[in-house]
């Protein structure tokens, strides 16, 4: 347990950020899963619309530091490639 005021404050800040980050990570995973589900169901329009909804959420998580920026970009890139491959079929 923290004994200094600054350590107690830092502990509170860390806990608040952890809770926020868990929420954002869960949201990102949900959006990714919706895109992948649409791809598996061979739903081209559904996959494209799900991707368009997922991209800003993933990008924002990268910008906020929840994910590393390159990790967010990699998620977006891979999802986009999968959707484009399905549309091309």
Curated annotation (Swiss-Prot):
Which gene produces this protein? Answer: rpsT
The protein's UniProt keywords, in alphabetical order, are: Ribonucleoprotein, Ribosomal protein, RNA-binding, rRNA-binding
One GO cellular component assignment for this chain's record is: cytosol
Respond yes or no to whether keyword rRNA-binding is given for this record. Answer: yes
Record organism:
Syntrophus aciditrophicus (strain SB)
What does the entry give for GO biological process?
Answer: translation
User: Is Ribonucleoprotein one of the keywords?
Assistant: yes
Provide the transmembrane region boundaries. Answer: none
Assigned protein family:
Belongs to the bacterial ribosomal protein bS20 family.
Please give one Gene Ontology molecular function term for this protein: small ribosomal subunit rRNA binding
Signal peptide residues are none
HAMAP family tied to this protein: Ribosomal_bS20
In Swiss-Prot or TrEMBL terms, this protein is called: Small ribosomal subunit protein bS20
The UniProt function text for this chain reads: Binds directly to 16S ribosomal RNA.
